[in-house]
Amino acid sequence: MLNAVSRRTLLKFASTVFPVSAMDLKVFAFGARRPRTEGNAIMVTDTFPAQPPELVREMVTVAHFDLQRVKELSDARPSLVKAAWDWGFGDWETPLGAASHMGNRAIAEYLLSQGAPPSLFSAAMLGQLEAVKAVLAGQPGVQRVRGPHSISLLAHARMGGEAAHGVSEYLQSLEGADADPPSPLREEDIRALLGTYVFGVGVTQQVDLTADLQMYANKKMYTYAPQLNWTRKGTMTRPLFHLGNRTFYPAGAPSVRICFTEGSDGMLMSVDDGELVLSAVRKRSKS
């Protein structure tokens, strides 16, 4: 979740677009390269014609907070307003989704003006009460669907402030529009679980489990704040919610299970996403 890091940290993970002067270069053969006649050639990657992942990630990142950069990226590559990024475990987010759960009306309205498909979540944040009612009338129960990072529909309306007050009042009358409380997590369980879990020899084959939750304090996005942070080395933090018996689900992926059990080798972690994805054992403390 992006509130978990500073703007500087976010931008460290993002990269800049190709120079605009390079955009008019023609591709002559897939996997080939234009002769360097003007000293400004580009390679065609294996992912072409899909959008460059580094640009998608940056666009979704800056759509939380930086309107100017959003405009620069969309001016250079207009299709980025419809991009989507997976922060982990299938927690997909679009630029409009990012702006919506942050309550960033200016960015949301700009993205919509550039062709980003509107959503129920953007309508809730923008205070579009009749649109929200129409969707719920056509699809009863859809208020239970969560947005990026498991943020509820009602929370999106809360982030819209006074302009979305009518939507907030309406959603409060509907069952399931807000998040359910997670299972309590005892302090002794937290202490028992924290540490670094290893599932291979590579430097990125480690997961840090931490309990620094100050980033979620006083935030309207979550009615019930996450209880732990799960971070694979080199990736963004995934907030965890407790289901009971030391079993959790990561934000944006309620069907995934992250379980902790005591074993002969120490504390074990397993990740199940329809099938067992990985098992890891916690590093032993140096004596």
Task: Mark where each language-model region is.
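N-terminal secretory signal peptides and thylakoid transit peptides that target proteins
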Residues: 1-18
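C-terminal segment of N-terminal export signals and the immediately downstream linker at the start
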Residues: 24-61, 66
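Ankyrin-repeat boundary/"N-cap" motif
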Residues: 49-61, 82-98, 117-124, 145-159
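Conserved ankyrin/ankyrin-like repeat signature
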Residues: 69, 106-107, 131, 163-167
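Ankyrin-repeat C-terminal turn/loop position
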Residues: 78-79, 115-116, 140-141, 176
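Peripheral terminal and inter-domain segments
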Residues: 177-287
